[in-house]
Regions:
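Short amphipathic alpha-helical elements of helix-turn-helix/winged-helix folds
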Residues: 13-21, 82
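Basic amphipathic alpha-helical segments that dock to polyanions
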Residues: 18, 45-50
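Short helix-capping/hinge SLiMs at alpha-helix to coil transitions
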Residues: 19-23, 69-70
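A short alpha-helical element within helix-turn-helix/winged-helix DNA-binding domains
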Residues: 29-36
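Key DNA-contact positions within bacterial/archaeal DNA-binding proteins
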Residues: 40
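Beta-hairpin "wing" of winged helix-turn-helix
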Residues: 53-68
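Conserved segment of winged-helix/HTH DNA-binding domains
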Residues: 71-96, 111, 115-116
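C-terminal regulatory/oligomerization modules of transcriptional regulators
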Residues: 96-153
Length: 153
């Protein structure tokens, strides 16, 4: 079971990096260098995020990417939905086959309950909250997100 895929992680790091910059837009090349994300992956991720309306892109000299909405409004679950489709922690071993225990399976009911709690908590995580350090203040290093330092000087 993998809760966060590599593409979701890369997307989250890129969005955090963009959100932490003071400039109007951030180039893909800058993010490749700073975030150490392979160029082909990053380009596809940025295009997808632009297509989904989370990023704005400007082409040409001085172009790049910027947030299309406030970082407080971009949720980790948005990125998970875009890059992972339906996220499911518990998948019954019988899949879609007929299960004699379908209505009475105690383990499934418990895991479903845990899954609901996990997703309730995930829906409360925004890019802005990921960019804060443990005591709720903005990180001193711009673009710090999810244990990755996007900006090293």
């Amino acid at each position: 079971m993998k809760l966060i895929t590599r593409n979701t992680d890369y997307a989250m790091r890129a969005v955090c990096y963009i959100a932490g910059q003071d400039k109007m837009s951030v180039s893909a090349e800058e993010m490749v260098t700073r975030l150490k994300i392979p160029r082909p992956f990053l380009r596809k991720i940025l295009q997808t995020l632009s297509g989904e309306g989370l990023l704005k892109s400007v082409k040409g000299q001085g172009g790049g990417f910027s947030l299309a909405c406030p970082k407080e409004k971009i949720l980790l679950t948005d990125l998970m939905r875009i890059f992972q489709n339906a996220v499911q922690l518990n998948e019954c071993v019988f899949k879609k086959k007929i299960c004699p225990n379908r209505g009475t399976c105690v383990l499934k009911k418990e895991i479903d309950s845990i899954e609901k709690d996990v997703f309730r908590r995930l829906r409360g995580i925004s890019i802005a909250s990921l960019m804060k350090d443990g005591n709720g203040s903005r990180s001193r290093r711009k673009g710090k997100c999810y244990g990755h330092s996007a900006s090293r000087h």
